[in-house]
Amino acid sequence: MKQLWLDIGNTRLKYWITQNETVIEHAAELHLQSPSDLLLGLIQHFNHQNIQKVGVSSVLDQHNNDRIRSILKRLHIPMIMAKVHQEYAALRCGYDHPEQLGIDRWLQVLAVAQPDRNVCVIGCGTALTIDLVKGYQHLGGYILPNLYLQRDALIQNTKGIKIPDSAFDDLEPGHNTIDAVHHGILLGLVSTIQTIMQQSPQQLVLTGGDAPLFAKFLQPYHPQIEPDLLLKGLQHYVRHQLP
């Protein structure tokens, strides 16, 4: 069976086509605040793939999600749009109001939750998201601006100092303003993760574009990089869909 999986984030649209659980096609594109237009341009391609089911993860608002549903109806196949539940597939949400938890974070936790397993899941995307899960209990988490959002905020609010792009590649004290900014921002996020990991023994799972960068500085915790963690969570969600 061929299935289409969509991950519609704040800035990118990613899709996977799988056949018998094997990924046979994968792509990711910036949607420039118009994900429905980007999806519309892909529909003809999807129509020729003999896809039999589509699973969707979308962080968009209700209006945009309605447009996404409308476009996907052109495929004339069953569609499942994932949402956060108080409890689903044995996993219990740690938020007081589950609807406030991002679907991307929920699916990432769903992908790693197992009995007798404590996991810290770090999403290294537009924001740095941190979620803790013990067995099948989601314990809540943290959201921080990512490396680039912090740098941009500093540039916008610091008069007289120009901070050009540079690499986030070192935790040593900077010997010029550019390095001091980049090393300082990276140190702040790495230190946050280290503090959380020191509070209780747990497995560290990293996902998202900057996962390899953070893994480089978190080697004592033996980080596991999972590029397609959301896909695994979405597949798990669809397998255990509610009637």
UniProtKB/Swiss-Prot annotation:
A monovalent cation. Ammonium or potassium. One of its GO terms (biological process) is coenzyme A biosynthetic process. It is an enzyme of class 2 (transferase). The active site is at D104 (proton acceptor). Its main location: cytoplasm. ATP binds at D7, I8, G9, N10, T11, R12, L13, K14, T126. CDD domains: ASKHA_NBD_PanK-III. InterPro entries: ATPase_NBD, Type_III_PanK. Its cofactor is NH4(+); K(+). Belongs to the type III pantothenate kinase family. This is Type III pantothenate kinase. It comes from Acinetobacter baylyi (strain ATCC 33305 / BD413 / ADP1). The lineage of its organism: Bacteria, Pseudomonadati, Pseudomonadota, Gammaproteobacteria, Moraxellales.
